[in-house]
Design a protein with these regions (language model features):
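Regulatory and interdomain segments flanking nucleotide-handling catalytic cores
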Residues: 1-125
Length: 125
């Protein structure tokens, strides 16, 4: 079963330089991907999709969790992701602008990230 991962930049609207932040995120993600063993590599690497969101697909939950942990530990101060993980079938829907990822795995990941976001909104800064 595939594992869908959504990553959302925490506080992206408050970042002083969103463009520079994305460059740093891209570099950190590339570093983590290079350093992970082949057995933990994503099937589809973590890449931006829209706004401050990114998506990846992993073969196992172990691989997804290892990637997420390493990514969080590698991010510099001031940059943070929140994650949603969904386990289940995923597929692509053809579009004139490229394939769109869809399916129960993505729906579960979206539901998970929505729960995390709602809980973070209720915390004291």
């Amino acid at each position: 079963m595939t594992v869908a991962v959504l990553a959302d930049i925490v506080g992206s609207r408050r970042l002083p330089d969103r463009v520079a932040a994305q460059r740093v995120l891209d570099e950190v993600i590339a570093t983590v991907e290079r350093e992970l063993p082949a057995s933990l590599q994503p099937i589809h690497p973590l890449r931006p999709t829209t706004g401050d969101e990114q998506q990846a697909v992993f073969a196992t939950l172990e691989a997804a969790l290892a990637f997420i942990l390493q990514l969080q530990l590698t991010l510099p101060d001031g940059l943070e992701f929140r994650f949603g993980i969904g386990i289940g079938p995923i597929g692509a829907v053809a579009s004139s602008s490229g394939d769109l990822m869809d399916g129960p795995g993505w729906w579960a990941a979206r539901a998970a990230i929505d729960v995390v976001h709602a809980k973070q909104q209720r915390t004291i800064p």
